[in-house]
Amino acid sequence: MANLNQIQKEVSEILSDQKSMKSDIKAILEMLGSQNPIKESLEAVAAKIVNDLTKLINDCPCNKEILEALGNQPKEQLIEQPKEKGKGLNLGKYSYPNYGVGNEELGSSGNPKALTWPFKAPAGWPNQF
C-alpha cells in the first residue's frame, strides 16, 4: 500500500501539471483569438488554391494547343439539315394470307385447318404426349 506521503506527492504533482496546462490553454486561446477568424482564413486558402490551379491550367502546353485549335474554327458551324424525315417503315397489317398458322379460336387465321398449339396429332400418328 502506498503511504500517505507518496499520495500527497502524486496529488501535488497532478495539481501542478493541471495548473501548467491551464496556463498553456489560456495562451493558446489568446493566440487563436488574435488571428483572423476561421472563415476568412479558409477563404484566403481557397483563393490561393484556385489561383494556383488557374496558373497551372494556363501554363499547360496542351491547353494552348486546344485554345489554338478552337480559335481556328469558323465562327458558324455549317450543319447539314436532313432532307426530309421519312415516314419510316409502313408497319401496317400483314397482308399476305397466313393460312396454316394461328389458332382458329383466337380468330388469328381465316383457315379452319390452321395448326393449333398444343399440337394435336392427326389420326394414325403415335401419341407422343
Swiss-Prot record:
This is Virion-associated protein. Homotetramer, through coiled-coil domain. Homotrimer when interacts with icosehadral capsid. Interacts with capsid protein, and with Movement protein. InterPro entries: Caulimo_virion-assoc. Keywords: Coiled coil, Disulfide bond, Host cell junction, Virion. Residues 1-31, 38-59 form a coiled coil. The keyword Transcription regulation does not apply. Plays a role in virus cell-to-cell and plant-to-plant transmission. Interacts with virion icosahedral capsid and movement protein, thereby facilitating virion cell-to-cell transmission through plasmodesmata opened by viral movement protein. Also interacts with aphid transmission factor, attaching the virion to aphid stylet when the animal feeds on an virus infected plant. Aphid saliva may later detach the virion, inducing release of infectious particles when the animal feeds on a new plant. One of its GO terms (molecular function) is DNA binding. Its main location: virion.
